[in-house]
């Protein structure tokens, strides 16, 4: 949040990217522009805000370097606000200071393992002063365990990794608005003074041209009443506002005479029904706006009010309440706005522009980052504690009081716990892949407490605004009800101390672009003229063209002379977020499709073997490193030892560092997080170099998918409507195979009938089923399991039942009590299978922390290898998504002239109307990168290659290239490179200069009639896997009321034969089929059992009974006081019996059917 500005050296344009990170792969870059600023730390929005909250040393260091920062930590600030707490008589006080932390209780991995919270004990110094005797008692007080942020910007709460999302809210301040009156068509003006905490103050000019005021959303009254209540006389009002007719007419209509009457009038409006007195009215008004305990504009509100009204400009902010001058200046501004004045002279003599505010402008919306959100929660907890302290001060003996006896920390601890556990802004971290986690931490949400609700939010607040430029990405936002309410921070953006988002610009002085970087808020940017990053410059930094394309306030674009330009963008990718900046040729994609592309990259699952894209954007390395899933060297040195589990580095200063790998760990979303070394023993490594790849990374670069040979053509209609045809090679060679890990948990508790027991001795289970269980009853690691298999054996005591005479005889003879237990073992859920890769056992005997009543807890991890299959969803990076419709044998796939079969066939119809042409350009450049190129310069450098550096005139096969957004490969360069690709080993060029090739049909060997676009596209396998969605049911749980099967895979439900399906049956006249479907196959409970019995006994199927839903319908009609009866054909009333049929009970018992099985808790209960 408070990061200082970094200046990079003025290096020449590099033909390779990733140069700032040692040991990084060499990606050939098509960028034409030099970027004077490195991409800042992508997690700074989280980490710096939390450092401010706890008052970390690093934060103080940064605060000292900048003048606009109040050098006080967030905890210190909130303790100073609270102190001193005085009793009602003012004879004693308690104050707090010096918050500090002890060491964290357990490391991150242990907290995840044992369901603990990653936290450190918080201590403060509490000082009790007896004002009567002057006695001071000081103590260090424990204030509870405070959740700490990990290095990755996350929190571990009860063993799960969570992220606190930054919240976009309307800033406290003063806002002027304009509206048209529907009846008179007059332009009306109003103003709201919005505090951080406290009552709203609203002024408005109505259609009768009087100025009114609303205090705390109560009834409107003339504004002069408020001025008189503040001590103003009629003469003073005339002297200050004599220039305004509407103020004079308001004064004439005001019936109050003097301050006392005005105060009483306000009191009557605010407290109707209570007897008004001058003192109580005076106290009420002061408490509402002028007492810090009740009213808080916040530092940012004070700053905004001063800026808008031109008060105390340039002076340090001290007070955070309203002043009389604020109220008067606000009224004058409103009156002048209504008069149509352009400027107003502020009390300090400065000229202030008079204009209406745009509430959606980023100058009026600020960010509550994680530190401020937690600080607000602590403030709530401390204010609850304050009440307890005051009560204890009055009840306890003064001599015996110490700070410890007064303080109850429970409200503070509860407030923090409540925030992390239940707040809308504390979210379960998206760990699908490293990019999804990184984007989650950089997310900006307008929802949450104090924000908008998705039902109330209109189109204006959701829309892209010109002030978003360089601050919030205009592309990346969810589809659906949250569109525009949730955004993503732009690549270079940072947050200033007031919570406004700033973006960097290069300073332009007298038409010369310098390397000085200034961070501007949206308000400041409106005052300047800004040129775009790709404006051509000469070697000295002068603009090459006399007229430069710039943007002014409100996003207006025009050409101006170079001397008028104030600033220039630092980078073409300045306006987009990290995920959007990873889409090559973004500039050729329609924004709607780019939105889908950015979102779908976050849904890519980590594959068994990651592969970095042939065509990247240069953002892949920074994204992967900052996401924190790769292992990075802390100090330069030499690799001493490498194994699959750890890497040891001997640093140059003689210290030894061991880096542990995460091996096949389960992420929050069930994907596999595995790290593997990419360095060798004896290798020299520099500080910041990547030692080991994580999920979805290759050589330290983000690698979300695979480079596949794609042909864009229709194929027998099998790829109609975005369906995709795949080669069987991708299945056989595990190209798109991913590993998914599920966690299954069971606990043994104390019950009323005795303790549950985890055991191998399970009643009525064959030895075959128990074969893979160890002596404790827990499955062995490495066992292959499928649905229904026992993972952990558990028995639960059953209540004593009435014994049969035979059992009583056996007990009398043998004297032993039959074990009354039932099998409640943990079984593999329906539709799942895999290999057991890990087991964790927690036991009270081993002193593990377990919930009350739990004696033992067992977790089993089952890994499943999922090959790509029909029904899985694939996508490119341009919003081009589809479901696999057919997997063809390799020999049936279309092939190139040299016999190379393509991997994937996409339909041509997926491109034109979607306007995502970037996928075609990526396909062409992918082929160029895979084949390599050599530009013929014998007759001089071709015109299209004039801007390419010398190193880029040739490249070997399997090169990796970068085409940064808005500064990438040009169309002419792409065409030229396609004509310069290297031939294959037979000396033939497979793809023509237009990017098309002659393809042959794999089945007939005949060439297709037209050339086909062929190249390499980066394809992602998304988390929407068919294995998670496919589902079938024979019998299962029923709804308690209607007795119909439940719906959905999670409930093990069935397919609903709905209204339209019934119509279809009626149309065909299939009466008996329809009757069967509506009764015995659905909710005729008696009929169901009788049919089952008939099938078992081989008898004819009996007549259906009455469906349960018909009985429910009758009851509902009767509940509406309608007397509904069912009559037979002869007019006799038919009695509806409620399933107490003895025959039914008997038949069910004989067949072993449990008729009480309703809304089963789990699939295992169905057995």
Curated annotation (Swiss-Prot):
Its EC number is 2.7.7.6. It comes from the Bacteria. One of its GO terms (cellular component) is DNA-directed RNA polymerase complex. Belongs to the RNA polymerase beta chain family. The RNAP catalytic core consists of 2 alpha, 1 beta, 1 beta' and 1 omega subunit. When a sigma factor is associated with the core the holoenzyme is formed, which can initiate transcription. NCBIfam families: PRK00405.1, rpoB. This is DNA-directed RNA polymerase subunit beta. It comes from Mycolicibacterium vanbaalenii (strain DSM 7251 / JCM 13017 / BCRC 16820 / KCTC 9966 / NRRL B-24157 / PYR-1). The gene is rpoB.
